């Protein structure tokens, strides 16, 4: 996948082409490592997410997967036996956080054993607790009327390799803003960037506070090309505003001017691979 963006530099920038070829990659690693059905099922959840037969209080019933087959690093832990309480040192990454959320936020029961329950088919007690928690802690509302009325400005950001907060889920949320307000209105208060080689808060250095300050102070977003420094190479890349991706055009790969923002996306991508 690395060369699909024009340069092999350890950063998968053309995430769309990579994702469209993921089945071939999955076949290769399955044959190479002899992946079991259980392992493939786990990869499928990481890559494609999951859908519930019921909806949360806000109407959501699905969570999009990550870029697990396009450069994302999955940490499933060295211990195949879940501990109680779950321990990220030995069990799946973020397992202890999910365990704590259920123990202390959702069920209010410190003796709750996370893996002892079926969340796809919850009993009435668990269902009621999920509904109550989803209403109390919901942070997915596309409602920005007050924010817009007060001239609020938002730089919305996702990393393609973030395995803690799915970039595809954030894209879905951004689309909710566009569906509600229209693209022109959203552009007036929100700039959405998705960058390659970026995990959860790591992989990039960018001066977004200065950009936001200019926008809020002058009412105009910076018009010049904005660059970020990539941790993987130490070089610069231009900020890719969604749905664009960073394409190498030639020249010094450390120089941000050697790249462009491409909107070339495989035909039929949306609705199939997102």
What residue ranges belong to the model's regions?
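C-terminal His-loop and adjacent cap/lid subdomain of alpha/beta-hydrolase
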Residues: 1-274
